Amino acid sequence: VAMTGHDLFPWLSTAVPLMGALAGRIFCRDPHQLKTSCLLWSVLSLIPIAASDVAMPEGPLLLYLLPIAAAISLLGQPVHRDHRLSWLMTLVCLGLGIGVIVHQGVFAHLFLLALLATTISLLVHHHTTLWPISWWGIGLFGLAGVSVIMTAFTDPPISSSAAFLTCVVLIPLLPFHTGYLTALTRLPGNLPSFAAVLLPSVGLHFMVGMLPTIPITITGLVSLFALAGALYGAVKALAQTRVRLMLSYGSLSFFSVLWWFAAMSHM
């Protein structure tokens, strides 16, 4: 069966950043050219997205937001040899994130698993004395990966509960917020600033389809945890002296308000 344009563009949207990461290895010896290449590929990934016309319940904004966020995070990082891996991994994560949003069913789950596995690998291999390894945060991303598998191979209500667990890790909700905080504080280079947009965007895509299947009793608990998370995140953000932690807890407070709004709308 011939692949139509409607089928081709989602795959092309996913492939462009991944091809950019592969092509970028040519410039690994020259950090300036590598950064320029990664920037160009990030911008180029907007073209197939604009042409794909993929219909999504949450609208097309998330798809356009991801390449723009990737490009901005790359622009904000100074040229240095130590940042080469993070530039290439920005394109890899961009391709996987787009793949989660533009595809459906098993392909979306596979791309999300790959994104979670990539995040876990980066967190395991990149940590410093200032930011020691956080096994609790890594474990939460592992839990999200197991939940993705359960979502793909089980039926409701188990699949709905598994999808909910995935969402509360990607869009931080107390007490599952440590994974998001770990990504924003431990990932190398420019990846924390990109992950701050990528993870909630992917989670929001899943939340739109998941929330209507969650029982009212669960959404009531979500609203309570969301209010607690908003207060906790705000207080913790005010008490921080390190910028990454301040932004991380500020994000927790913001996304807790989003969870509260989503839960109350469902109720």
State where each predicted segment sits.
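Short hydrophobic alpha-helical membrane-embedded segments
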Residues: 11-16, 39-40, 62-65, 81-93, ...
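Hydrophobic/aromatic residues in alpha-helical transmembrane segments
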Residues: 19, 96, 148-151, 176, ...
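Alpha-helical transmembrane segments of multipass membrane proteins
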Residues: 20, 45-48, 97, 144-148, ...
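Transmembrane helix-loop-helix hairpins at membrane boundaries of multipass inner-membrane proteins
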Residues: 1-88
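Transmembrane helix-loop-helix hairpins at the membrane interface
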Residues: 217, 221-223, 235-236, 266-267
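Short helix-boundary/re-entrant hairpin motifs in multi-pass inner-membrane proteins
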Residues: 30, 37-48, 53-54, 72-82, ...
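Structural signature of hydrophobic alpha-helical transmembrane segments
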Residues: 5-16, 54-66, 104-116, 157-169, ...
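Alpha-helical multi-pass transmembrane bundles of energy-transducing inner-membrane proteins
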Residues: 24-36, 85-178, 237-267
